[in-house]
Amino acid sequence: AKCAHVSNYFATEPQIRLASRLIALAGAPEGSHVYFGNSGAEGNEAALKLAKLYGRTLPGASPSIGGKPARILALTHGFHGRTMGALSATWKPVIRKPFEPLVPNIEFVRAGDPIAMYEAFSATGLGQYGKGPVAAVILELIQGEAGVRPLDVAYVKKVRELCDINHALLIIDEVQTGIGRTGSWFAFQREDLTGGITPDIVTFAKGVAGGFPMGGMISFGGKLSALFTPGSHGSTFAGNPLGAAAALATLDTIENEHLVENAEERGEQLRQGIMASGNPLFTSVRGRGLLNAILLSHRCSHAAMNWALEHGLIVNAVAPDALRLAPPLIVSEQEIDEAVSILAKIPADLPND
């Protein structure tokens, strides 16, 4: 980039190139658009705003003629950010409650339960007990903050089916899982996570610019393109030339150095190594690519995390009985072996946290 920033009244060449690149990597159809922000939370805010505008177009969502406001469904244990809209779709009570009341008409549905999702859609109707139509479902294919929990592929397909039947949008939050992290450019492209379904909106951030603030969303196809009108959404620094150039350079590096493939191969090596380590503290490992969690025999994740850190390995106590492992995409075969060697030595008799 020759300029770090120009007014957002103008499009810039790096911004346009990046939008085209992301649409191509996502396999989004003609008419798709990219809306930039500076973080994952901002990407999810944009997606939720777009879903609210879409909800106003649905039958039964016009209060002026007896309708009821459209709803957005989110999943229990999901995490989408800490800004007000994203927080309203985030499950964790400890971070929600201090800021209540939050954005209305966002409801939580039990993750992984297709009957609960069906019942949430079925609540739509007129009369005293009926609710407004569902505008969108927002979910993570792998619930990262919940302990790296992949949703079942059959469940994801059922959610897509219910969205189609009820004319609702499917928003997939790829802030943690996107840009090669799970062994594909986007997690929704993995058959073992989605069965090949296509989302209506994908959000992204984190790895897209190699540490530079960048995030946003991709809306698939043209049906949503007219909903954001001039002034209805924007951000001073969103998609700035420097951020876009950083993202383009990052995507080039990931592609040229085959880091998506490396994530898949090293992730498989890591999971196999953990289960072959013989450590009785480890009961199982779950995840895709280089986003994984070790399930522990008892609730000692903070003690295990501290032990690993003292011995040269950074892991995250993502749940009381789970350690999250998310090494960089450039991690080598030798480094994975070294990590497994340290993990294998974590004492199995650590005290509960």
How would you describe each model-predicted region?
Residues 1-353:
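Conserved N-terminal phosphate-binding loop of PLP-dependent enzymes in the Aspartate aminotransferase
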